[in-house]
């Protein structure tokens, strides 16, 4: 019950006509911190205003920090395709890694198991499993150049080229190709670097 400034009491009558958000993307990050404990502490302090749905430790430990249907604060300013509010449409997964070290086998195995569950539960298309650097090129570099995207793509998570072309086909339009897969090409150099 709330009393409004004009003295009127609000009345609560619940409805069954609502739903929670449905995640359509998974954004993969690295923590840029030195331990899973440090990341968990950062994500539980109100003043940091940063969070993720899951954190995966170097040892493969998976910590869920937020219900999948709720909006975490992991993506910040970025876009993919026409979606400019990535936090509202995605699940954020942070990998405990400072960005300069290889990702452990245990960590990647846990990530693959979690992605299998999330992709099935929410019917997330494989091309919608992307990195933070994809949605915020030049601003973010995670999950780092050491992240095994090819391994994930071979398991059905994310995309990876079947072959590397030595030369682009005649009349190939880089900007159009990047836009088709979801990149924001307002800053073409940034989109290419992502």
Tell me the role of every PLM-derived stretch.
Residues 1-127:
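Active-site-adjacent loop/helix surface patches within enzyme catalytic domains
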Residues 99, 103-194:
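Basic/polar, cationic surfaces and motifs that engage anionic cell-wall
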């Amino acid at each position: 019950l709330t009393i409004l400034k004009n003295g009127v009491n609000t009345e609560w009558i619940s409805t069954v006509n609502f739903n929670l958000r449905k995640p359509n993307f998974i954004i993969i990050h690295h923590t840029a911190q030195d331990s899973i404990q440090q990341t968990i502490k950062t994500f539980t302090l109100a003043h940091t205003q940063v969070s993720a749905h899951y954190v995966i430790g170097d040892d493969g430990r998976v910590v869920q920090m937020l219900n999948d249907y709720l909006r975490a604060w992991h993506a910040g300013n970025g876009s993919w395709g026409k979606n400019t509010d990535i936090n509202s449409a995605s699940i954020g997964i942070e990998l405990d890694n400072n960005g300069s070290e290889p990702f452990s086998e245990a960590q990647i195995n846990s990530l693959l198991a979690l992605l299998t569950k999330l992709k099935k539960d929410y019917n997330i298309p494989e091309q919608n499993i992307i990195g933070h650097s994809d949605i915020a090129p030049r601003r973010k570099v995670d999950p780092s150049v050491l992240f095994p995207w090819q391994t994930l793509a071979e398991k059905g998570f994310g995309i990876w080229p079947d072959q590397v072309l030595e030369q682009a086909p005649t009349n190939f339009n880089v900007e159009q190709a990047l836009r088709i897969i979801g990149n924001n090409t307002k800053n073409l150099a940034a989109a290419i670097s992502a």
